[in-house]
């Protein structure tokens, strides 16, 4: 009997835990850094979105990184419809400086894009606009360009010879 119970215990459904990445902004506000995690919620959907957002709201163990979502910015609502996640933030989202906002937006979106094809942000129920007032709209992985250099605002100077034909 004990052997049958032992065998039956091993036949239970094993939940596969998948590794995900949470993206954090470094303290110098120059790049986004990925840290691997394993989600506790194995079922897809809103529970996973909430878990990832909670990780983005906490201070990472790595002292060179900052929490992605600033403490004063609150998540007011989360919608998960078809292939799109919409996150509504409090008005304090707009208190970030432009560089911090862009890196924060990239880190949140890249984290959530592991669960959906598109991510949209709203602030107090209205579509997110950037520093120039343009509507940001739905974001996907193609919305972000990786900067291979260390500096976000780096530039290069070169002398070139240009040849023109008539």
Q: What is each of the regions a protein language model found here?
A:
Residues 10-166:
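Bimodal "functional hotspot" detector
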Residues 1-6:
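Bacterial N-terminal signal peptides
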């Amino acid at each position: 009997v004990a052997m049958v119970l032992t065998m039956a215990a091993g036949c239970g459904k094993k939940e596969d835990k998948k590794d995900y990445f949470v993206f954090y902004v470094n303290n110098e506000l120059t790049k986004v850094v990925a840290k691997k995690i394993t989600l506790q919620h194995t079922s897809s959907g809103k529970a996973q979105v909430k878990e990832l957002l909670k990780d983005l709201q906490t201070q990472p163990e790595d002292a060179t990184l900052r929490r992605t979502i600033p403490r004063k910015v609150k998540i007011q609502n989360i919608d998960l419809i078809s292939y799109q996640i919409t996150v509504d933030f409090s008005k304090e989202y707009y208190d970030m400086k432009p560089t911090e906002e862009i890196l924060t937006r990239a880190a949140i979106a890249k984290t959530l894009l592991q669960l959906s094809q598109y991510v949209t942000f709203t602030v107090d129920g209205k579509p997110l606009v950037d520093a120039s007032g343009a509507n940001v709209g739905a974001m996907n992985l193609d919305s972000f360009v990786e900067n291979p250099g260390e500096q976000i605002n780096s530039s290069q100077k070169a002398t070139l010879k240009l040849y023109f034909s008539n």
